[in-house]
Amino acid sequence: MSEKNIGRKNVEKRLIDSAAFLVSSVGPNQLTIRDIAYHAGVNHAQIHHYFGGKKGLLIATYKQLAFEHVQQLERRNISPTNLGDEPLSSITDDYFKAIIRAVLDDQMYLVRVQIDSGLSMSRETLNQLTKLKNQNKPTSEMKSAIAIAMVVEFGLSAMEEYINEVLEMTAKDKKVFMEYFYEVREHGINKVLSK
């Protein structure tokens, strides 16, 4: 690979990494190309040069976040029968927060990036559940079970610090809360699997 290509890939990676970090904290609407470039330590014109502008960079960023999310969950063998023993949002926190920010900012095209790229773990889990139940297409119960798991995962990602502060959660409280969390997260899927 030429030195020019190595330099380009390095700049692209720095821009995507910076955008991923920043978008999860301020959201796509408040994020500026100058903020991203400053954080990445590059000239803001490089965003236009490599990505065609902010929108192109955000699409690349959301695709990268989804890819990393899929990789992490695949490493843990996450499936409808094994949602793991930790909140999924704690594995790829930037992904969850970036998705929440895109939804709150009404930038649903960024949410669709994972779907259009074949990188939606929620869709993949729904497809796996459909196959496990020998169905041709997902039922309303299957979609609802996955939706409940999504709600509790995204809810925890968005609200954990708020919950801790308002309810003054102790270590014991958090332990009980997490037991309930796992129970709720898996309830709908287990109900579908048991039918």
Which ranges hold each PLM region?
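Helix-turn-helix
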Residues: 14, 18-56, 60
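Amphipathic alpha-helical segments used for helix-helix packing
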Residues: 88-120, 160-162
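Hydrophobic alpha-helical connector segments
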Residues: 60, 68-104
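Short alpha-helical scaffolding segments that buttress acidic/His motifs in well-ordered protein cores
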Residues: 99-103, 146-153
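C-terminal peripheral helix-coil segments that are non-catalytic and often amphipathic
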Residues: 2, 119-131, 135, 155-195
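Core catalytic ATP-binding domain of two-component histidine kinases
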Residues: 104-105, 109, 130, 150, ...
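Amphipathic alpha-helical packing segments from all-alpha helical-bundle domains
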Residues: 69-75, 107-134, 140, 144, ...
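N-terminal intrinsically disordered/low-complexity leader segments
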Residues: 1-9
